[in-house]
């Protein structure tokens, strides 16, 4: 986690005021690798996605009924991993083990994977879960605001990532496995492409991490939120997606860029839509000057139009009692291996 580097930003509200009146507010927040314990209630939108009582992925509450997470948490869209009856969502949770006095649990009504999710490239690694019933907001359970279309997160933008993932590669959190928080700066897409291998990072991704290493999300943090603060409001910029190892020098973590998915998210949520906030970094972006062999020059203007179609994941009945657990971790990019091992 990184010490704060606050950036002056402006914001405009793009959705009806109801969800904006509560989203992104963390009344108990006074301020995963290289991180520290998060005080109870600091990140009230953080959820744990569990199967058979076991933590699989993180996620974020975006309104009273919907959770935003990563598509790769459900590696096979026709089998065990996407049978909604096997999943539970834990909200208001602080520890994976031990006491959680502010926790509530909900069943899952529906799982929706982005129709253009590519498990090979990790592009469009984003998914939505609908809860079985609406939650009641408390100081420990609240929705996060989402970055609206055309939001700008310049290289260096201060961000926080939360989760219950490993504290080092292969090392689990110690008992009672308390939610961790880590502060990391955004790494621009051009520089991130140069570091991970040109072509690895798409416009649907956003990177963050220290180039010296030591602070990062890691396995088990998948699907969890990366947020930045704008005034008194926290805005989610990314969803934990993939990386090569954890907290390694010059290998920032990669996240799904939330602002590219506003139309897709709203197409699934017909009422009580999430609070989308336009996040605009001030000043020029230093990433525009990043260059390396094979990287094209920066365009004068880049726009992204996410697809509008939807995919409803099948919900097969199953009586299998013992099946292998899917990876359920922040995944490694196959393109990274290709670029670095075969070129």
Name the predicted role of every residue range:
Residues 1-21, 89:
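Cleavable N-terminal signal peptides of Sec/SRP-targeted secreted and luminal proteins
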Residues 24-33, 46-52, 148, 157-301, ...:
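Extracellular trypsin-like serine protease catalytic domains
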Residues 37, 96-103, 120-123, 138, ...:
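Gly/Ser-enriched beta-turn/beta-hairpin loop segments
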Residues 46, 66-68, 103, 126-128, ...:
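Conserved hydrophobic/aromatic beta-strand scaffold that supports enzyme active sites
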Residues 77-78, 112-118, 134-176:
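Active-site substrate-binding loop(s) of clan PA
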